[in-house]
Amino acid sequence: MSGVRAVSRLLRARRLALTWAQPAASPIGARSFHFTVDGNKRSSAKVSDAISTQYPVVDHEFDAVVVGAGGAGLRAAFGLSEAGFNTACVTKLFPTRSHTVAAQGGINAALGNMEEDNWRWHFYDTVKGSDWLGDQDAIHYMTEQAPASVVELENYGMPFSRTEDGKIYQRAFGGQSLKFGKGGQAHRCCCVADRTGHSLLHTLYGRSLRYDTSYFVEYFALDLLMENGECRGVIALCIEDGSIHRIRARNTVVATGGYGRTYFSCTSAHTSTGDGTAMVTRAGLPCQDLEFVQFHPTGIYGAGCLITEGCRGEGGILINSQGERFMERYAPVAKDLASRDVVSRSMTLEIREGRGCGPEKDHVYLQLHHLPPEQLAVRLPGISETAMIFAGVDVTKEPIPVLPTVHYNMGGIPTNYKGQVLRHVNGQDQVVPGLYACGEAACASVHGANRLGANSLLDLVVFGRACALSIAESCRPGDKVPSIKPNAGEESVMNLDKLRFANGTIRTSELRLSMQKSMQSHAAVFRVGSVLQEGCEKILRLYGDLQHLKTFDRGMVWNTDLVETLELQNLMLCALQTIYGAEARKESRGAHAREDFKERVDEYDYSKPIQGQQKKPFQEHWRKHTLSYVDVKTGKVSLEYRPVIDKTLNEADCATVPPAIRSY
């Protein structure tokens, strides 16, 4: 408890624990670089002028560094510290400001508190939800670990909603069933009313304060430090004073979240800018399946704010301008609780066919007022408040205007189920030494072409923990940290300096808006080849316009203009890979719906018996992962593909789910 009290005192004083070395330009009395949970611990920081004489550069050494302090980053960081590793956590936000806090609906686990359940049924639903693009070994691992992960959170103090007999309350969520799709709707989503992400993030942060982790708060990670194909840490900018920090570590975990802000209308925080995805791209490593962008069915019309799927899990329904519960036509069994890609497309079709609501007929309604007010007050208190603030709607009396809104990135940094980052060489997966990824920044791939609601929070805690366990299996605390070249990170500092003094003709905000509107119009719920091709050309042209940016703040203390410009560079790399991957994929699968290629293209035609069919060659079908690379100088995108993993971790314990026609 002494460590916790020490941190509490530090935070109240708004200062950080001293390091051995202050940067050369640090003003007297300024807040120091970072705090540790143990206020007596000191870092091995050393001032260096090897890469810049204009910017204060400080070198640090740790066993491991985690980039990002959302759910996945915190779980990885304190898992490593718990195992005895000297761990740093670099985050551009205070941990409890991370976007995990915005998750509403819940976290899936087959606890069986509402009816009989089995993790294998959860496994089946997740594979089906992925439209058979998910890797079944990773899905096996996640769903089997789910019950223990939720119990662990409960033991950490997460205040789950309860049933009358005191068990964790579980609500219905989309795409989830019992008995391998034959037993009706499952109630598998554990929740804290409609504020589950908020509770999870604060629970994990509170738990992390038990351990001696060094937090670099409000530090912007610029790039990975790569040498000889290995990751040896990160280079970061201290936003507060402009100093540069090279954090050398034997193991680096990327947990920076998604890149929803590539789109104009999204539920993501403004800080969801794909920083880790872009860092990996600049390191010459591939990203995977970025064309699969999830549109959440129920974003508030006009504002884009998330209205949780839990509303429909509690009994809410979608209606069109005729008052019709239209999902019965598109998903006769699951209805409003079909998977998100199915519901989003159905809503879009209703609007296209003239059954939209409002003066412009450009949205539909989510009706909740038929539910008891007591149920809304207990199970959906946050939604009631959000609807009133952003839509002016009293949910007990009138429906909420909603529209599909960008919500989640299924793609990301390719990893195996242990969290190890992969590259694809000569048709084989190879682990990138020293580099791990988890959370929305990663692509394990447990979500495939479409994520099931409430599997994202599960993904965070399962794979954040997996990264820590994997590192503990292969390394020991205190192992020698590999060296880096004296000028490591020099290009990152040169880029920073170039942006700081950029004197072109385009504002960062203007270019960002052009990119967001282009992505919104060219890579939306429904996609078509000609529009995607036009989008590729436009995004590539906008990428070139990065050379013509103008920044206005030349300072180094809290230069948010500079930080937003760095974020725009990251967003552009994500946007390029997303739209080029979408244009190349000539099929419809999960969240990627092509109007000119409406069918899923598998190795067999699974609408018919496969006996007697000839298997399509790998080059002729699309049940495969996209790997994308970008030439950072030109913006040219290169694509290749790797097979989906169909085998589970133990076929005797959990059999592979063979592809089938997906319906709800």
From Swiss-Prot:
- In-chain residues carrying the UniProt-annotated modification Tele-8alpha-FAD histidine: 99
Mark the transmembrane ranges: none
Q: Start and end of the transit peptide?
A: 1-42
Per the UniProt record, which EC number(s) apply here? 1.3.5.1, 1.1.5.-
User: Phosphotyrosine modification sites?
Assistant: 215
Residue numbers of N6-succinyllysine PTMs? 179, 335, 485, 498, 538, 615
Q: Please list the residues that bind FAD.
A: 69, 72, 91-92, 98, 100, 105, 221, 275, 440, 456-457
GO terms (BP aspect): mitochondrial electron transport, succinate to ubiquinone; nervous system development; succinate metabolic process; tricarboxylic acid cycle
Q: Is Electron transport one of the keywords UniProt gives this record?
A: yes
What are the protein's UniProt keywords? Acetylation, Electron transport, FAD, Flavoprotein, Membrane, Mitochondrion, Mitochondrion inner membrane, Oxidoreductase, Phosphoprotein, Transit peptide, Transport, Tricarboxylic acid cycle, Tumor suppressor
| Membrane topology, as annotated | Peripheral membrane protein
> A single GO molecular function, which one?
electron transfer activity
Q: Which GO terms describe its cellular component?
A: mitochondrial inner membrane; nucleolus; respiratory chain complex II (succinate dehydrogenase)
Q: Where is the active site?
A: 340
Domain of life assignment: Eukaryota
Record PTM N6-acetyllysine, positions in chain: 167, 179, 182, 335, 480, 485, 498, 517, 538, 550, 598, 608, 624, 633, 636, 647
Its subunit composition reads:
Component of complex II composed of four subunits: the flavoprotein (FP) SDHA, iron-sulfur protein (IP) SDHB, and a cytochrome b560 composed of SDHC and SDHD. Interacts with SDHAF2/SDH5; interaction is required for FAD attachment. Interacts with TRAP1. Interacts with LACC1.
Purpose: Flavoprotein (FP) subunit of succinate dehydrogenase (SDH) that is involved in complex II of the mitochondrial electron transport chain and is responsible for transferring electrons from succinate to ubiquinone (coenzyme Q). SDH also oxidizes malate to the non-canonical enol form of oxaloacetate, enol-oxaloacetate. Enol-oxaloacetate, which is a potent inhibitor of the succinate dehydrogenase activity, is further isomerized into keto-oxaloacetate. Can act as a tumor suppressor.
Name it: Succinate dehydrogenase [ubiquinone] flavoprotein subunit, mitochondrial
**Gene of this entry:** SDHA
